[in-house]
Structures are given as structure tokens and as C-alpha cells.
Amino acid sequence: MIVGIGVDIVELDRMARSMKQPRFLKRLLTDAEYELSQQYPLPRQIEFVSGRFAAKEAYAKAIGTGIAHGLSWRHIEILPDETGRPVMTAPFVGKIHVSISHSQTYAIAQVILEEEGHHVSS
């Protein structure tokens, strides 16, 4: 059974400006996400970081707390599986579905949370 849905959209230009702040990436990304982001050239890096930001915001909306009350950006990790599909690890007992997409202007993400034992087919 679905217990939460969250969606977020991010302007790539706004994220590019935020990324100029020295500690921004270290606050937003886990160590593994940060290492992966550093492998990309700058235009792709902005898309990557924007997608992660949108997905983490979408998760916070789906869980219902926002980034507060003991939940930080670094509690949520999104890494690609062997096929490149994003896989989210976060404090939730159940299945987390995440989808990330971007254009030249925006990144968007959707997160769906399912109760343990009540999964829809992926």
C-alpha cells in the first residue's frame, strides 16, 4: 500500500549558483554521492546534483516531515544500480521508488513510499 508520495522540481541555474558555495555539496550529498558527482564534467554535475536535491526533497515530502525533525540531506542517499537506475536508501521501513529526470532547465523527481509487504510491481 502506498503511504507517501512526493514530487519536487529544481531550476538548474539556481542549483549552479548554490553549488558555488564551498560547503553546499558536502551538506547535501553523502560521501558516495559526492565522489560520484566529481566524476562528471560541470554541466552534467549540475544535472546530477539537481536531481539528487529534487529526489531528497521529494522523499522529505513523501515521509511528511520535510528536512527537519532529525532528518538531514545526508540521511538520504541515491546511487545508481548496475543498470544506472537510481536507488534511494533512507530511513524508511518499506519500498522506496524514485524517478529522476532533467531537461536543460529543470530537474524533477518523484518518490513513492510503500509499506513493507505491500509492493506494487516495478
From Swiss-Prot:
Can you say where in the cell this protein is located? Cytoplasm
Gene Ontology biological-process annotations: fatty acid biosynthetic process
Superkingdom as given in the UniProt entry: Bacteria
Write the record's keywords in alphabetical order, separated by commas: Cytoplasm, Fatty acid biosynthesis, Fatty acid metabolism, Lipid biosynthesis, Lipid metabolism, Magnesium, Metal-binding, Transferase
Q: Name one GO cellular component term.
A: cytoplasm
Q: Which Gene3D superfamilies match?
A: 4'-phosphopantetheinyl transferase domain
Which GO terms fall under molecular function for this chain's record?
Answer: holo-[acyl-carrier-protein] synthase activity; magnesium ion binding
Signal peptide start-end: none
Q: Give cofactor(s), names only.
A: Mg(2+)
Q: Which reaction does it catalyse?
A: apo-[ACP] + CoA = holo-[ACP] + adenosine 3',5'-bisphosphate + H(+)
UniProt keyword annotation of Magnesium present: yes
Coarse class of the primary localization is cytoplasm
In terms of InterPro entries, this protein maps to: 4-PPantetheinyl_Trfase_dom, 4-PPantetheinyl_Trfase_dom_sf, ACPS, Ppantetheine-prot_Trfase_dom
Q: What are the binding positions for Mg(2+) in this chain? A: 8, 57
Any Pfam family: ACPS
Question: What EC number(s) does this enzyme carry?
Answer: 2.7.8.7
- What does it do? Transfers the 4'-phosphopantetheine moiety from coenzyme A to a Ser of acyl-carrier-protein.
Q: Which family does it belong to?
A: Belongs to the P-Pant transferase superfamily. AcpS family.
Q: In its UniProt entry, what is this protein called?
A: Holo-[acyl-carrier-protein] synthase
Name the species this protein comes from.
Answer: Exiguobacterium sp. (strain ATCC BAA-1283 / AT1b)
Q: Which gene encodes it?
A: acpS
